[in-house]
Design a protein with these regions (language model features):
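Charge-rich, low-complexity N-terminal segments
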Residues: 1-275
């Protein structure tokens, strides 16, 4: 039996629900190994077909989505809305078109449970000579500060318009031209497992919750979650606006200093803000 591998086939940028952490933005890189017999070309599968079949499926069914552990007792589904109750008693209510959510056949979301579902979904699409698939999902190795955030971009023409998708992101802050690790750690802590919401999309609030809603090209979206898990900004939560928001906030707090912020959106991409 022969083996074929592709490292960093794609990156999944998504959010998921966890009974302890709440709504978590995440970014996982995907490696794949195909095991099987050689075909008439002397290949397990042509690399072009690997990307066409596997990357396409992963991107369509798992990327830029809300992943929900459907076996968790915290999960309840009613029509287009789902409710997920956290261990601390608070809850999230998410309403969206079906394409914005993927139910994972497990009680928790982990690289292993998601990998298993990707494999189960992929195998029926493989040619008969492919006998098994291995998927390795892994987060970027980050030595410095990072945070997990979720958001939705109602004006985006692609899947970023989904109200609860997210990223695991590095942050780099230059203060007068020098890295400031303390400020990086401060914002990473402040934005740990945060939902960055646009004030314009905030349609209601109670003592404990915010409710965001908008209609975009893909349909109607709504999200209710604890205020303590949210951070409000005045603009769309694009990475360009996030980077500039951070730079402006730092300048406001330290007006005598100059700042450059590199805010990442997942792996190896992002924007720069200056103030």
């Amino acid at each position: 039996m022969s083996e074929l591998f592709v490292q960093r086939l794609t990156v999944l940028d998504f959010s998921y629900l966890d009974v302890e952490r709440g709504l978590v933005g995440e970014s996982w890189q995907a490696d794949i190994v195909l095991q099987g017999d050689l075909d008439a070309q002397g290949m397990v599968l042509d690399f072009g077909d690997v990307k066409k079949i596997t990357k396409k499926l992963i991107d369509e069914q798992f990327d830029h989505k809300l992943l929900v552990p459907e076996s968790s007792p915290a999960f309840q589904q009613a029509s287009e809305c789902l409710t997920f109750t956290f261990n601390h008693g608070k809850k999230i209510i998410h309403c969206a078109p079906d394409d914005a959510v993927t139910l994972i056949h497990a009680d928790t979301i982990t690289p292993e449970t998601v990998s298993r579902q990707i494999i189960d979904t992929l195998m029926p699409l493989m040619p008969s000579n492919v006998l098994s698939i291995q998927i390795h999902l892994w987060p970027e190795k980050i030595s410095g500060a990072f945070y997990h955030y979720s958001h939705g971009l109602k004006l985006h023409c692609g899947n970023c318009q989904r109200i609860a998708h997210g990223h695991r992101s590095r942050i780099e802050i230059l203060r007068n031209g020098e890295r400031d690790n303390e400020l990086e750690a401060h914002w990473a802590t402040r934005w740990r497992d945060i939902y960055i919401g646009t004030r314009e999309d905030l349609i209601d609030e109670t003592d404990g919750d915010y409710r965001f809603a908008y209609t975009s090209a893909q349909g109607a979206f709504a999200l209710q979650l604890p205020k303590s898990d949210c951070y409000l900004i005045d603009t769309e939560s694009t990475v360009e606006n996030i980077a500039q928001h951070l730079a402006d906030a730092l300048k406001h707090e330290h007006p005598e200093d100059d700042f450059q912020v590199r805010a990442f959106e997942g792996v190896d991409k992002g924007a720069i803000g200056r103030a």
